[in-house]
Amino acid sequence: SKGLVGSEMCIRDSTAIHNPTEGVTYQLGNLTTINSKYKIMTVCDFRTQDIAMGGQGAPLVPVGDSILFSKFTACLNLGGFANISRKKNKKVIAYDICSVNIVLNYLSMKKRIKYDKNGLIASSGKIITSLLNELNSLEFYKLNHPKSLGVEWVSDVIFPILENFLIKYPLESVMHTYVIHIVNVISLSLSPSDKILVTGGGAHNKYLIKKLKLKTEARIILPSNEIINFKEAIIFALLGLLKVLNINNCF
């Protein structure tokens, strides 16, 4: 904010290209330019380094989750993509589950609306069984973790499927079915004993959260709006601090 002065800056890069299976990711934001402009220590481009070391480059939050939110058995982020991090056998595992807001917002824009507030559009539709079956059977869901998703996968795989069904079915029903698909896939990563912290823009989607609570026996916990909206920013600030302190910031 205006007048705020810091000694270090951490940039959460925007991903332009992400294909970890080919060892490729590209983040918007140039370290040298940013550092020259603001004249302070700058940390950025986390994903490139992670992939260079054999990782997926996403998700990058499990370190922060394990430090700041350790009282939860797992942390579920509902952003452009759903990703989860949890402790398993004294290790932290994290992976992308499915595409969420990147798809729901794409469908909302067809009605000239930026996003489906509270899931009102989706809640007015009906299930399309054939679409749900096709989505649920996608190859990505059969892969073992670690695994991650990028916009390229959504453009090449998800959007063509949805466009095909939009020819024959109302948008409301396509969106409704996609929400059910999201819930189905996420529930496979949860167990009845889980205490799940849910954050990200999708946590504000009341219809999505309602369906998720009905689908799983796990305890779904929504924190304050500040944590829902800014948890990822807080964690990236922590990752930057760990880098400055020369402490491992990647599992």
Identify what each model region corresponds to.
Residues 20-27, 35-36, 40-115:
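Phosphate-binding/catalytic loop of phosphoryl-transfer enzymes
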Residues 223-251:
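Glycine-rich phosphate-binding/hydrolytic loop that grips phosphoryl groups
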Residues 15, 80, 201-204:
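Active-site metal-binding loops of divalent metal-dependent hydrolases
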Residues 24, 195-212:
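Glycine-rich phosphate-binding loops at beta-strand->alpha-helix junctions
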Residues 93-183, 245-249:
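Conserved ATP-utilizing enzyme core subdomain
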Residues 183-190:
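A short, acidic, amphipathic alpha-helical segment used as a generic capping/interface helix at domain edges
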